[in-house]
């Protein structure tokens, strides 16, 4: 689930750079940081292996640069422990293979919290040491046994304001109401957030969503399929289905919603009302070669508000530490999915439920949308 979102963040960053929308000073800083110390290499071998280091695995591309600038270089300067970025992608299968090898080369991973929970229960992920990592620097409810939240994104309703004029949707019921809001729709291919959207539209109260009634949600979506023009798998597709006029309304990632609103000069707008907040997290592989203590110190250092501001600036990720909110410029607060004003309108995905049920629920969902 998270891998698709993270890869899309990289696409957005590349697009911003191509358009000159990313700070030249920031890119210069990144380039300088990458030259010094060659931090993008893998863990050293031989005599060089005696040097303390950590390997942090994310989804590659410009995420390597962003994570290195925001977290890796400051941590190395503070502690003398080098952080080497690996962009090969920490899928559940890859993490499992690392653990089962008996000699993992990875230390930390950018993980779906629910994946970390599942693998943690199998003994593959270290419990988060909350004597080192500070729960007070997290938003309430987003610190789990095997994963520490580091960022957020949301699934939100984006719509063509030219088609609807002054009338704007106010929640998921409007998304599913083609009489009030005529036109085609687009939804996410991999299920997350879509069950919640369907249930909210079907009258379930936000605080009564979990445990999700997957059958009810899938039935709602099945009965609505004639109005769905596409089930998108990547952010670029979710954006183009709106800008190309194929759909007049779509459930898309908040990062893409902000971008398409800017690109269309406000023709495509989005709302936070009944948005669905999804967290990202860091986790530590059991038996990591750099040591649990160093890995926990790294996670704690990543809680610094100024460092999380870099990730918001570069990748559009909502910060995990609420203290970062005050550092975001006023003209960008509307793009922060966890700004208090925006967060109050939304519902958070329940990670423990996903840890127990996502696999089976996704199988059923794929059958519905593929039929």
PLM features: residue spans?
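A ligand-binding cleft/hinge motif common to bilobed small-molecule-binding domains
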Residues: 116-120, 243, 248-266
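A bilobed periplasmic-binding-protein/Venus flytrap-type ligand-binding module shared by bacterial periplasmic
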Residues: 156-163, 199-204, 279-292, 299, ...
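Mature extracytoplasmic/periplasmic domains
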Residues: 285-346
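N-terminal twin-arginine translocation
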Residues: 19-26, 35-50
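Periplasmic-binding protein-like
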Residues: 153, 214-224, 264-286
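Early extracytoplasmic/lumenal segment of secretory-pathway proteins
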Residues: 50-113, 117
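Extracytoplasmic ligand-binding site segments that recognize negatively charged/polar headgroups
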Residues: 61-68, 104-241
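N-terminal secretory signal peptides
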Residues: 1-26
């Amino acid at each position: 689930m998270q891998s698709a979102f993270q890869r899309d963040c990289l696409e957005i960053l590349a697009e911003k750079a191509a358009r000159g929308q990313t700070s030249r000073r920031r890119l210069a800083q990144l380039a300088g940081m990458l030259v010094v110390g060659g931090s993008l290499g893998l863990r050293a071998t031989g005599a060089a292996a005696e040097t303390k280091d950590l390997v942090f695995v994310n989804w590659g591309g410009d995420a390597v640069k962003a994570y290195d600038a925001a977290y890796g270089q400051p941590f190395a300067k503070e502690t003398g422990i080098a952080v080497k970025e690996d962009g090969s992608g920490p899928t559940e299968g890859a993490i499992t293979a690392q653990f089962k090898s008996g000699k993992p080369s990875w230390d930390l991973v950018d993980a779906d919290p629910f994946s970390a929970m599942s693998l943690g229960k199998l003994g593959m992920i270290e419990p988060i040491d909350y004597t080192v990592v500070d729960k007070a620097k997290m938003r309430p409810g987003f610190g789990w046994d095997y994963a520490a939240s580091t960022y957020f994104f949301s699934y939100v309703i984006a719509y063509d304001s030219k088609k609807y004029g002054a009338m704007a949707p106010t929640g998921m019921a409007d998304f599913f109401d083609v009489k009030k809001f005529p036109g085609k729709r687009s939804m996410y291919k991999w299920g997350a957030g879509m069950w919640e959207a369907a249930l909210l539209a079907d009258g379930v109260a936000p605080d009564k969503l979990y445990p999700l009634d997957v059958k009810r949600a899938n039935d709602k979506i099945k009965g609505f399929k004639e109005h769905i023009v596409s089930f998108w798998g990547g952010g670029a597709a979710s954006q183009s289905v709106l800008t190309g006029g194929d759909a007049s309304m779509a459930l898309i990632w908040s990062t893409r919603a902000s971008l398409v609103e800017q690109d269309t000069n406000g023709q495509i707008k989005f709302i936070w009302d009944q948005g669905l907040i999804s967290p990202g997290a860091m986790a530590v592989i059991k038996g990591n070669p750099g040591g649990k203590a160093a890995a926990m110190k790294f996670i704690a250092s990543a809680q610094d508000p100024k460092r999380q501001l870099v990730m918001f600036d570069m990748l559009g990720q909502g910060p995990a530490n609420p203290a970062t909110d005050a550092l975001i410029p006023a003209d960008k607060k509307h793009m922060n999915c966890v700004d208090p004003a925006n967060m109050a309108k939304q519902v958070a995905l329940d990670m423990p439920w996903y840890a127990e049920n996502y696999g089976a629920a996704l199988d059923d969902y794929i059958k519905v949308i593929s039929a």
